[in-house]
Regions:
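Active-site beta->alpha loop and helix N-cap motifs at the rims of alpha/beta catalytic domains
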Residues: 69, 74, 87-150, 284
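Conserved, mostly hydrophobic/aromatic
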Residues: 43, 62, 73, 138, ...
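Alpha-helix-loop-beta-strand connector modules within alpha/beta enzyme cores
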Residues: 83-118, 161-175, 211-228, 272-288
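Active-site-adjacent beta->alpha loops and helix N-cap segments on the catalytic face
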Residues: 22-33, 52, 77-86, 95-105, ...
Length: 321
């Protein structure tokens, strides 16, 4: 049940008509990329960073330069699974007063660019907003679904029910430490794609692509026909090409945020984001025909009771992008 605060916030967010991407999900994007013999490029930024309009302009630049799917981060005051780069951006957004209704407005704006928009959020803000209200308002805004990295498989039943009723993708995470039974349960609960967080530790750009990423993708594909997208801190085109050679999707977040943090001003930062997106897109497209094994058509894989956390059965807390 939605809380009064969530209901009030939701009423503000649902004004207007749904964006063009409403309930479209990510399946079509993966299918088109697979037909082209390449992986999908997924880009993340927190809503409201570097500013309310600046984030929308940055998303636009990313899509224009070749990002296929956008992750709109919902800022949260306790981002324990994120590294210092993303935490700095999230702090900036929160200081600017960005809240869930603003994230939904950002999703509406981004969906107009033609790329599916997923909300990346810790579970607490969604629960406080109201699970059904959030699903309804996200669909109305044109959102494709949500990635919920800290939502455990045992506690996600309400979210799965609400998301399914609004035809939203539900993306959960697997990690190298996840045992086979956990990977299977997570995969049966995903719709759209499976997020493979292949590097232990908090988020952040990495200097090299390890073998664990490819092994995790292979293990995950033993349990699902859904596409498998990898987040491990990719920071350049060469790394994107490496990951695209074995995964259905390449997820990049910290590197985009770093470009904005390091820029002398917002306009320069957006240009840097666009340049990075173009470099990453070229890398992804340079691995044509290599990203096989996943069913890039997407869809729902089975009917598990709930989605899962990346860590499955271990005690670490991490999400990599």
């Amino acid at each position: 049940m939605s809380s009064p605060a969530g209901q009030a916030e939701g009423q503000q967010a649902t004004a207007g008509t749904a964006g063009p991407g409403a309930t479209a999900g990510t399946a079509g994007t993966f299918a088109r990329a697979r037909a082209e013999g390449r992986a999908v490029l997924i880009g993340y930024l927190p809503a409201g960073f570097p500013s309310r309009q600046g984030c929308v302009d940055a998303y636009s630049a990313m899509v224009e330069a070749g990002v296929d799917i956008v992750e709109v981060g919902l800022p949260y005051s306790d981002p324990l699974m994120d590294g210092p780069t993303i935490q700095a951006a999230v702090d900036s957004s929160l200081s600017a007063g960005i809240r869930t209704k603003d994230v939904l407005a950002t999703v509406r704006a981004v969906s107009a660019y033609g790329a599916p928009a997923l909300v990346m959020s810790y579970w607490n803000p969604i629960e406080r907003y109201g699970v059904e209200a959030f699903a309804a308002d996200l669909a109305t805004a044109g959102g494709a679904g949500a990635i919920t990295p800290d939502l455990t498989i045992e506690e996600a039943g309400d979210w799965l029910t609400a998301a399914r009723s609004h035809e939203l993708d539900t993306v959960f995470l697997v990690a190298p430490s996840s045992p086979p039974a956990r990977i299977d349960l997570v995969c049966r609960s995903c719709r759209g794609f499976v997020y493979a967080a292949s590097t232990m530790g908090v988020t952040g750009a990495r200097s090299a692509v390890g073998d664990r990423a490819q092994a995790l993708v292979a293990r995950t594909r033993e349990h699902t026909d859904l596409p498998v997208a990898v987040g491990l801190g990719v920071s350049g085109g060469e790394q994107a090409a490496e990951v695209a050679a074995f995964a259905d999707g390449v997820i990049v977040g910290s590197a985009f945020v770093r470009r904005l943090l390091d820029a002398p001003d917002e306009r320069a930062g957006i240009r840097a984001v666009e340049d990075l997106a173009a470099e990453l897109a070229a890398g992804v497209r340079s691995s044509r025909g290599a990203a096989g094994g996943g069913a890039a058509g997407g869809g729902t894989a089975g009917g598990g009771t709930a989605g899962g956390h990346a860590t499955g059965g271990h005690t670490g807390n991490e999400v990599v992008r």
